[in-house]
Amino acid sequence: MTHEFTESYDVIVIGAGHAGVEASLATSRMGCKTLLATINLDMLAFMPCNPSIGGSAKGIVVREIDALGGEMGKNIDKTYIQMKMLNTGKGPAVRALRAQADKSLYAREMKHTVEKQANLTLRQTMIDDILVEDGRVVGVLTATGQKFAAKAVVVTTGTALRGEIILGELKYSSGPNNSLASVTLADNLKKLGLEIGRFKTGTPPRVKASSINYDQTEIQPGDDKPNHFSFMSKDAEYLKDQIPCWLTYTNQTSHDIINQNLYRAPMFSGIVKGVGPRYCPSIEDKIVRFADKERHQLFLEPEGRDTEEVYVQGLSTSLPEDVQKDLIHSIKGLEKAEMMRTGYAIEYDIVLPHQLRATLETKLISGLFTAGQTNGTSGYEEAAGQGLIAGINAALKVQGKPELILKRSDAYIGVMIDDLVTKGTLEPYRLLTSRAEYRLILRHDNADMRLTEIGRDIGLVDDERWKAFEIKKNQFDNELKRLNSIKLKPVKATNDRVQELGFKPLTDAMTAKEFMRRPEIDYATAVSFVGPAAEDLDAKIIELLETEIKYEGYIRKALDQVAKMKRMEEKRIPANIDWDAIDSIATEARQKFKKINPETIGQASRISGVNPADISILMIYLEGNGKAHRKY
């Protein structure tokens, strides 16, 4: 079929949420002429649910996005109202930043960034179809009948894909926050042959700040020392005038109201068909599943400086409006609270992610990429991370350059994508630190050390960032080398000082680095014995030094495991392999291999239901069969 195109682009991104913004900024910054198409320009980078960025695992993803040259970290650093480091009482592997956002300012600031980006056209339009010829993307069709040519298309439609809002007995077609749903595109994605799933998520009511009795709640302030998501943000820019959040709880009266109205709850009446998020359940689901709990935490989170709206985190619900009001008024501090928005549930279509490659390109259609909630994830951060990788790979494909695949040992983003494409997901996927087997080397403090060079190689890290990174890396390397070369000897003067500090005396000579491995010895104490570095070191470099030195043994073990897995990841599996021709593989493994069509032995080994014997048989088969090949 010959198409008459009115406009032509290298890449078209459909949807301007957190995934779409990162995808389009990446492609345009890499030199591709890009169109970012969205149903509503006023909702670009909008936060339809929680007014926050980061959190456990998610905060590390934002740092990874920043290290690669993405935008989310820089944007939240400009627009937050509170910043907090989580899990400070635990090990470095699970520490992560979380920021309360001024949600309207966050969206406005991101829109400004997109509007001034070279090579990037922003258009309010609805895309109804993906145009495909001979198994390859050639463009898109708008609802008004316009055809735009493209060499690659990235679908980042979020919860708008055949979205339906559910509130009590009411159910109607809608995207998030009463925006338009994308119904025709959902139909046409299915017609293209993609397998489609149906998920559900929800959001809590918002209450008016001036109607809250804060005396009945517990204040939750931000940190009083500088912290940032972006490695380029300066401590001098740290916000001192932060806005606190507040903690309250449900109670028995709250639970009674919910239990008495379960017959009206869409979650239990059969109205909701989609699968909801395990790690962010509705309040009615929590009351039923955890009936023994006397109360549940609720955090009152301001949505910005210039609004009275307060987000009631932990109270996600689709109960009828009258029940939501009674529920709110049963809660301490909210007895007279004015509900400004009701909570609701939203159901939406997803593209089942086992159909994707680790580049986030669909296996079925060349040049078609998907990212974000379209792939079955939950959360702004997960969406942004996928959007960045999908955008990078769309640009690399257009330019005929080698693709970028982040491994599980490279980044939490790599863990997430590998989980999605290898295991699929039966519910909205959320990143957790427990999902990462190499979490000690995937830390908040070393994201730039892991990923900045990759960002530079693909063209997303500019000269200013690269110079700052080189300075930091050189300072780190030089100081680590110095600490490993200077020795402390067990002489009387040294041991007298050690004992004065309340520490065990030295029995043998040791390097300053070995001295720092002692749990009680921090960097400041060590340099008080051996003298300071040649130049003043930033606090973040000192933090990195302490972690790398104190956990060196564990880090080395993790890196050994990475090296072993790398050998498996390098063993490619041909795309045209005949799984039925491999004798002795278990039936379940054969079925999973056919469904997922893994690209490497490493990926095959992580598929649920596949055991080591199946992998051994597969490796023997591949060694004796060199005719097959993988081509995309």
From Swiss-Prot:
Q: Mind listing the GO biological process terms from this record?
A: tRNA methylation; tRNA wobble uridine modification
Q: What is its main location?
A: cytoplasm
- SUPFAM superfamilies from the UniProt entry: FAD/NAD(P)-binding domain
The terms under GO molecular function for this entry are: flavin adenine dinucleotide binding
**Pfam families per the UniProt record, alphabetical:** GIDA, GIDA_C_1st, SAM_GIDA_C
What's in the GO CC field?
cytosol
Which positions are annotated as binding FAD?
15-20, 127, 182, 373
Which positions in this protein are listed as binding NAD(+)?
A: 276-290
Q: Which cofactor does it need?
A: FAD
- Location in the cell: Cytoplasm
UniProtKB keywords:
Cytoplasm, FAD, Flavoprotein, NAD, tRNA processing
Concerning HAMAP family, the annotation shows:
MnmG_GidA (MF_00129)
Q: Which family is this sequence assigned to?
A: Belongs to the MnmG family.
Instruction: Sum up the protein's function in the record's words.
Output: NAD-binding protein involved in the addition of a carboxymethylaminomethyl (cmnm) group at the wobble position (U34) of certain tRNAs, forming tRNA-cmnm(5)s(2)U34.
**What is said about its interaction partners and assembly?**
Homodimer. Heterotetramer of two MnmE and two MnmG subunits.
Q: What is the official name of this protein in its record?
A: tRNA uridine 5-carboxymethylaminomethyl modification enzyme MnmG
Origin species: Streptococcus pyogenes serotype M28 (strain MGAS6180)
